[in-house]
Amino acid sequence: MAPQAYDRDKALELALAQVEKSFGKGAVMRLGEEARQPISVIPTGSIALDVALGIGGLPRGRIVEIYGPESSGKTTVALHAVANAQAAGGVAAFIDAEHALDPDYARKLGVDTDALLVSQPDTGEQALEIADMLVRSGAIDIIVIDSVAALVPRAEIEGEMGDSHVGLQARLMSQALRKMTSALNNSGTTAIFINQLREKIGVMFGSPETTTGGKALKFYASVRLDVRRIETLKDGSDAVGNRTRVKVVKNKVSPPFKQAEFDILYGQGISKEGSLIDMGVEQGFIRKSGSWYTYEGDQLGQGKENARKFLLENTDVRDEIEKKIKEKLGIGADLTAEDAAEVPADF
């Protein structure tokens, strides 16, 4: 005979009390007991990308994968996130497995290189062990691993050049991500894995492109960003930067498949002013008539480059436009408790 309802309720309460005693308060909770907290984020440096992500930046306590072709802007996007985390008083770490971090370029993007924790590990195991220890300290706000392709297993480094090491890196990544996921959530650390593209042989239909390191990262990542260079920006005949498109191919904190376009200027990184002009025109705050840009009746300049220079020199106007865009779209630091209740916890 089935137990009565009150017997089941009593058994459940006893089980919950035992779980709480063994694993601590909050180990199990009813989802409706507390109001949902807004998802804390780290801005990316491009307001267009923050909007595409749906919550105003990269989610804290989650894994983010940034991948794309060579020289597409992957590390630039990651370094801007590092700079923004540091600007908010956070501590950042950079695992430079490629041994290719340029401190001068990072400094130009706003990164405090004196405070940045940098490691250049010898093996993939060492890199991921260092990352795991830093995350478990609870003192790191953002950690970047550059790149997954450079996380070479110890057996491969110590072996001969022609030796076969099938699946070693994939197993290494799978084990590391299993360990790190809960630690990231508990510490509120954002882990950015930069990844490279490879081509699968013999693919007849669909895209032959794939990322390195097996499938584990695809599953564990809450956000996956596909970064592509779509155009070269020129000043006369001189190349001054790239037009970059980022597609949010996976997003567990907001609806996916949105995309953003912004300018990356050589030696300067993401053009915040250029991104604000694009979003300002799109949202109706900036008016574009021919090649002229105007804001509330005042001319910003003829051509996007002149308008960008105007905003660079007049930071009060730039900040005002940014505030209006964020308020209209409900992203960033101005998110209210009412807005937060509508933010989905997981997609």
UniProtKB/Swiss-Prot annotation:
A cellular component annotation (GO) from this entry: cytosol
Stored SUPFAM superfamilies: P-loop containing nucleoside triphosphate hydrolases (SSF52540), RecA protein, C-terminal domain (SSF54752)
Chief localization: cytoplasm
InterPro entries on file: AAA+_ATPase (IPR003593), DNA_recomb/repair_RecA (IPR013765), DNA_recomb/repair_RecA_CS (IPR020584), P-loop_NTPase (IPR027417), RecA-like_C (IPR049261), RecA-like_N (IPR049428), RecA_ATP-bd (IPR020588), RecA_C_sf (IPR023400)
Keywords per UniProt: ATP-binding, Cytoplasm, DNA damage, DNA recombination, DNA repair, DNA-binding, Nucleotide-binding, SOS response
Gene Ontology molecular function: any one: ATP hydrolysis activity
A UniProt-annotated Pfam family: RecA_C
Cellular location(s): Cytoplasm
GO biological process, one term: DNA repair
Protein task: Can catalyze the hydrolysis of ATP in the presence of single-stranded DNA, the ATP-dependent uptake of single-stranded DNA by duplex DNA, and the ATP-dependent hybridization of homologous single-stranded DNAs. It interacts with LexA causing its activation and leading to its autocatalytic cleavage.
NCBIfam families in UniProt: tigrfam_recA (TIGR02012)
Official protein name in the record: Protein RecA
Source organism of the structure: Nocardia farcinica (strain IFM 10152)
